[in-house]
A protein has these predicted regions:
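N-terminal Rossmann-like NAD(P)+-binding subdomain of aldehyde/semialdehyde dehydrogenases
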Residues: 1-146
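Rossmann-like NAD(P) dinucleotide-binding subdomain of oxidoreductase/dehydrogenase enzymes
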Residues: 129-239
Length: 239
């Protein structure tokens, strides 16, 4: 355990740094268990969404992120898992505050489960066949069965699986941390970059995750984190 995690933010995490917004709107975070205001985050403008998307696109198309060995991405995921685990008490405390769940649920599902997701995806990534040779018997297509071909007619293909690019993700408010981790970790292992739209009623834990992403050394633009209402969220997924 360490010091309490922040409860209020005035900036978004975009392109590797906390980035000011010209938004005048905010989301007020109210603790369901006490009814008290415990924090706030900005509400994204179109310009903020564009900046986050541009950062993700740049990191994907203009840097070596997608072509790095999967081992490097897995190591970053494991570093983040370790950081999450070290912060699990403060995270659980924050989640009880902003989500109103019990301490037990906060401990197990919200604070501990994401550690498992990041570690699991790192392990899967290391052993995943991103490239495999496939062999097909084309004899029947070449009339082999009817024509009595003596030579087998086979073809081999190298099938590669690669990242799709920038990925927007959203998680349900009641599973903000595990939901975000379940979506972002596999995208990261694949070599994608991500824009995370946090759930507005309880954005604070995922904003805390942004600082951890920064601290363990994810490159700028690989993971971007914003808060947005329905209109700007629709704009995000329209890209």
């Amino acid at each position: 355990g360490g010091s309490m995690l922040p409860r209020s933010y005035s900036e978004f995490y975009i392109d590797g740094r906390w980035t000011p917004t010209d938004s005048t709107e905010t989301f007020t975070v109210i603790s369901p268990s006490t009814g008290e205001v415990i924090g706030q985050v900005p509400s994204a403008t179109r310009a903020d969404i564009d900046a986050a998307v541009e950062a993700a696109r740049h990191a994907f198309y203009e840097t070596d992120w997608a072509s790095r060995p999967v081992e490097e991405r897995a190591a970053l995921c494991e570093a983040l898992a370790t950081r999450l685990y070290e912060s699990k008490d403060e995270l659980a405390e924050l989640l009880v505050d902003e989500l109103g769940c019990t301490r037990m649920l906060a401990d197990v599902y919200q604070a501990t489960a994401p550690t498992l997701h990041w570690n699991y995806n790192a392990e899967v990534g290391r052993n995943y066949p991103f490239q495999e040779v496939r062999t097909a018997d084309l004899g029947p297509l070449a009339g082999g069965s009817a024509g009595g071909m003596i030579m087998p007619y086979q073809t081999q293909a190298l099938v590669g699986k690669g990242p799709v690019g920038g990925v927007p993700t959203m998680a349900a408010y009641n599973f903000s941390m595990p939901g975000t981790s379940q979506k972002v970790a596999p995208a990261i292992i694949a070599g994608c970059t991500v824009v995370v739209k946090v759930p507005e009623p309880n954005p604070l834990a995922v904003f805390a995750l942004a600082q951890m992403v920064h601290d363990v050394g994810f490159p700028p633009g690989v993971i971007n984190i914003v808060a947005a209402g329905a209109e700007q969220s629709a704009y995000l997924v329209s890209h």
